[in-house]
Amino acid sequence: MAVVYYDQDADLNVLKGKKIAVMGYGSQGHSQAQNLKDSGLDVVVGLRPESKSRAAAQAAGLEVKTVAEAAAEADIIQILLPDETQARVYREEIAPYLTGGKVLMFSHGFNIHFNQIVPPADVDVIMVAPKGPGHLVRRTYVEGQGVPALIAIYQDASGKAKEIGLAYAKGIGATRAGVIETTFKEETETDLFGEQAVLCGGTTALVKAGFETLVEAGYQPEIAYFECLHELKLIVDLMYEGGIKYMRYSISDTAEYGDVTRGPRLIDDHVKSTMKSILKEIQDGVFAREWILENQAGRPSFNAFRKKEREHLIEQVGDQLREMMSWLKK
């Protein structure tokens, strides 16, 4: 069973007198910085001089400096920038100021696990990764609750890395819900696999295949959209709330029978074998190398994929149908 830490396992005093630099002010950056500040900690946000987020961070009462300035004065540096920019920013603006005794932190292990960032041996390297989007991390904190998180120690130069990581997790509210111990390897590989095989890649491919099957069989695209995409949220919300068993309890018996008899025919051993090969590409670093090279080349394939996907009939139909849905934000 997983090792889980809670409020009583963490001490915010570990971070007293230390300056924490949060690099980036996106989904995780804004929530973690604000939560740390409201926990009474000394926080500075590191941003590009021209960043559009500077005004928002300042409006939240946060000190804002350039990444280099923030790195120079911080004891703890949390990098919350996009995966594809972290290595360059680290190399140019953080590494020169990452002196012995400092702490380097992440909320995703990609760049450490795949050696795009190689920290010096005399710094702690820690991951605290909330398992929810930034707005939820912030909202639950304000409500006196929290979002569960993962904690991993890659390097423990000080001998106190776990204490520091747990204190940070408490500062953002995560120990209120529970913090699960993991490793950089496990977090990175499972996160990428989930995105590719299930949550993003698997789901979108399944939805499009179902939509295309109905349209090619002569059914109206609008009806196919409702049955294969729009209603997916209803099912996912039920699973999110109570697991697969709760979803099956909530749907009709006809739907449940179709689920348990037809689902395994669709997602069969062949699909599982493909999943295993996708996982192996992640474990072996094949995907990481491919993505790194794609970015270095200016993203030609990625941009072409984006353009092609946006032109799919399902997007056109969806745009039209959502105009009928007054409850959706425009």
Swiss-Prot record:
Domain KARI C-terminal knotted: 183-328
InterPro entries on file: 6-PGluconate_DH-like_C_sf, KARI, KARI_C, KARI_N, KARI_prok, NAD(P)-bd_dom_sf
Residues that bind substrate: 252
Requisite cofactors: Mg(2+)
Residues reported to bind NADP(+): 25-28, 48, 51, 53, 83-86, 134
Pathway assigned in UniProt: Amino-acid biosynthesis; L-isoleucine biosynthesis; L-isoleucine from 2-oxobutanoate: step 2/4; Amino-acid biosynthesis; L-valine biosynthesis; L-valine from pyruvate: step 2/4
Keyword Ubl conjugation set for record: no
An MF annotation (GO) of this entry: magnesium ion binding
Enzyme nomenclature, EC number: 1.1.1.86
Active-site residues (renumbered): 108
Recorded catalytic activity of this chain's protein: (2R)-2,3-dihydroxy-3-methylbutanoate + NADP(+) = (2S)-2-acetolactate + NADPH + H(+); (2R,3R)-2,3-dihydroxy-3-methylpentanoate + NADP(+) = (S)-2-ethyl-2-hydroxy-3-oxobutanoate + NADPH + H(+)
GO biological process, alphabetically ordered: isoleucine biosynthetic process; L-valine biosynthetic process
Protein family (similarity comment): Belongs to the ketol-acid reductoisomerase family.
NCBIfam families noted in UniProt: ilvC (TIGR00465), PRK05479.1 (NF004017), PRK13403.1 (NF009940)
Protein name per UniProt: Ketol-acid reductoisomerase (NADP(+))
Organism lineage: Bacteria, Bacillati, Bacillota, Clostridia, Moorellales
